[in-house]
Amino acid sequence: MSFFLTTPTAIDLGVNIDHVATLRNARGTAYPDPVRAALAAEDAGADAITLHLREDRRHIVDADVRALRPRVKTRMNLECAVTPEMLDIACEIRPHDACLVPEKRSELTTEGGLDVVGHFDAVRAACKQLADAGVRVSLFIDPDEAQIRAAHETGAPVIELHTGRYADAHDAAEQQREFERIATGVDAGIALGLKVNAGHGLHYTNVQAIAALPGIAELNIGHAIVAHAVFVGWDNAVREMKAIMVAARVAALHGGR
């Protein structure tokens, strides 16, 4: 358990290891090993390990999930689509958390949040199936009031707000608008009694404002850490991200939001 979990400045870092697997799969080798990366990330201060088992297995594969589960020392957060196959795998593996995400085979990366409003019955059934298996459920959604309310009504105890539009904003004004949507979404989730996480597209120079939001419990970050590790090493990349997040939270608590 992280030291930061016991302090008022608590904000967790979930390190996503998907793109360690992307690098491995680019040449069809056995290295780099995502499990080794996960364990090293934990040693460097990660509070959770996130991995996305996509239907097309483009990066993480079933063997990675099965190998990691008994070895993870923090929490395993398995991202998966709302499909019978993926739900069955999640119930069998029983990660600490399962984050339900939308998925399209044609996308380069996840393009938006899960449409809980439009697929309410299926999502609610998935939440029950996972909860019955002892898995805590998170829903990856856009910072939209209707989606947040619907997520709460499914019985999911956790939401992860999609920060991709904030991260991909073309100018400062657009980024500020998206930031305000996220901040409002955090407040809405907390008001409903939900644990609120966030992630997607966050990196070393845009994470500060999001980490400063006092209601966010956890940020899930992967690609930026893998990329930075090319230059500074894996341990340093993880430690730097965690330090940036905590510093932003401390500054916000001392200076106000």
From Swiss-Prot:
Binding site for 1-deoxy-D-xylulose 5-phosphate: D18, H19, R54, H59, T109
Enzyme Commission (EC) number: 2.6.99.2
Keyword terms of this UniProt record: Cytoplasm, Pyridoxine biosynthesis, Transferase
GO molecular function terms listed in the Swiss-Prot or TrEMBL record: pyridoxine 5'-phosphate synthase activity
Pathway: Cofactor biosynthesis; pyridoxine 5'-phosphate biosynthesis; pyridoxine 5'-phosphate from D-erythrose 4-phosphate: step 5/5
Site residues (Transition state stabilizer), renumbered to this chain: E160
Reaction(s) this enzyme catalyzes, per UniProt: 3-amino-2-oxopropyl phosphate + 1-deoxy-D-xylulose 5-phosphate = pyridoxine 5'-phosphate + phosphate + 2 H2O + H(+)
UniProt name for this protein: Pyridoxine 5'-phosphate synthase
Active-site residue list: H52 (proton acceptor), E79 (proton acceptor), H200 (proton donor)
